[in-house]
Amino acid sequence: MSSRDKQDSRKKEFKKSLDSETARRKREENSIGIRKNAREELMLKRRGIVQPNPSTSYQIIVPPEVQEQFQKYENETMENKIKNLPGLVTALNSNDQAYVYSSLVQFRKLLSIHAYPPIDQVIECGIIPKLNQLLQCNNPKVQFESAWALTNIASGNNRQTQTVMESGSVPIFIQLLCAETTDEVKEQCAWALGNIAGDTVDSRNYLLKYGAMNALIPLLHYGEDNGATTTSANSERKIGLIQNVVWTISNLCRGKPQPDFSVVSQCLPAINELIRIENLPSEIYGDLCWALSYLCDGPNTKIQAVIDSGVVPRLVKLLEYPDSIVFTPALRAVGNIVTGESSQTQIVIDNNGVELITRLLAVQKKSIRKESCWALSNITAGEPSQIDVVVSNPKTVTTLISLLSHSEHDIKREACWALSNSTNNSSTKSIQTLVRHNILKHFIDLLNSQDLVILKIVLEGLINIIKEGEKTKTKTGVNPYVNLISEMQGESIIYDLQEHQSKDVYKKAFELIEFFESSDYSDSENSEPNINQNGQYEFSSNYNSNSINI
């Protein structure tokens, strides 16, 4: 399984003056790390281990003596099974259907061993062409076992997977997805294609070229087939088919370089229809969200295509799903959407996205808290009204500020981004709210950080806050935020930062010092804000409309 490196590279360097678009930070491949498909059942490649219950309408009669012969083989040690593979190959190439089927089952069982299945030894037997031949017979039980064996070979390493792909199995799998055969056979073919798609980008593109996506999409339909009565067994089989189809589609949508969007985006209407259905297995919702996260990872045109599908309200709702295998990819997808234009971000906000993302800040898993901060930082890089939504949520601001002093370093950095962005292009009310939540003290504490990114983010935030205070100064003669920073011993730290080796840091420090030197904060008491009995700063009545309590 591949994993995203946990680095902190950014597509866009921090800039002194951030507008609502440049402040948004697109995720690079190595940027923010949430482990995709961490559970064994959702690996990029999977092997069938547990025997499902295939249809009994195509029974193959195996005489007792043949059953006994193959049962004896099954009871052998692995070493003896490998030694006796030539005999199993002979049986597979027999003209006797009972021998062919029984040997096929034994090959499948060998390949389904949980640890270290003998994939290479089976490949060396040269049976893959025979498996492809059996895959095209008109007995679904034989097709099923053949597809299962090929699926497990394709679950191996790159060379083993390529052996299946190069043998000509792919067109047969795709043909069977569209054929009149059982759901079990289709499920196994979809599973095999998912293993191949998860191998390499070239393999993924090969499947897309052969029309795998177009063959898979119709199988996402969750209705009754041909008006037949739906039984519990039928429903369970349909769920199994859909689960594997969704997983395979998610593998077809993932990877860098990204697949042809015009091809993979065709699944969006079907995803929108399926994701709205209640009480499906968590794995289905999880893979649907992963597929969406891949589809909206990129230019705003891709984000808009996902939005236009109508899926966003349900996607945001899944942020409150109780299982992490769902809310993890849902957060990834929502996080990608809010990297878009302000109008695209607004769709998430309008569906209670800020509140639901805020709840995830309390999740124990570090990567979820980090991703949540990252998503909020892109929302606070938006319009003033969007910043107001974040800042006016007491839980959001309180938690973000708490993370500045009580979290791991990389989470602290993301929280810094979210809060610093909220000081830029924001309303007077939002700045006042942040100051009331003691953001100045936390920013000043971070001025001692050895992380250059944090230093620059914090200094930018302080500059934005002080610039807001200049509006007050025009009315009262005093910039209240300059005073507060000075009283918190922030001024001396900022002075020292003028000697910093980083050009960006000392330039920002110098800009801040200019505000201190131009402020007459050491004048008489009349030029200072009064302190009321609650220890709050008050300003003259002519500043009533913008008064603040700190």
UniProtKB/Swiss-Prot annotation:
ARM repeat feature ranges: 116-155, 158-198, 201-241, 256-297, 300-339, 342-381, 385-424, 428-467
Subcellular location: Cytoplasm; Nucleus envelope
InterPro entries: ARM-like (IPR011989), ARM-type_fold (IPR016024), Arm_3 (IPR032413), Armadillo (IPR000225), Importin-a_IBB (IPR002652), Importin-a_IBB_sf (IPR036975), Importin_alpha (IPR024931)
Entry keyword annotation includes Endoplasmic reticulum: no
Major location category of this protein: cytoplasm
Basic and acidic residues bias spans: 1-30
Assigned keywords, A-Z: Cytoplasm, Nucleus, Protein transport, Repeat, Transport
UniProt entry tagged with the keyword Nucleus: yes
Residues covered by the IBB domain: 1-56
Domain of life, source organism: Eukaryota
One GO cellular component term: nucleus
Chain intervals for the UniProt region annotation (Disordered): 1-34
Any one biological process term the GO annotation gives: NLS-bearing protein import into nucleus
Assembly mode: Forms a complex with tnpo/importin subunit beta.
Job description of the protein: Functions in nuclear protein import via a substrate-importin alpha-beta transport complex that passes though the nuclear pore complexes (NPC). Binds specifically and directly to substrates containing either a simple or bipartite NLS motif.
Domain notes per entry: The N-terminal hydrophilic region contains the importin beta binding domain (IBB domain), which is sufficient for binding importin beta and essential for nuclear protein import.
Identification of the protein by name: Probable importin subunit alpha-A
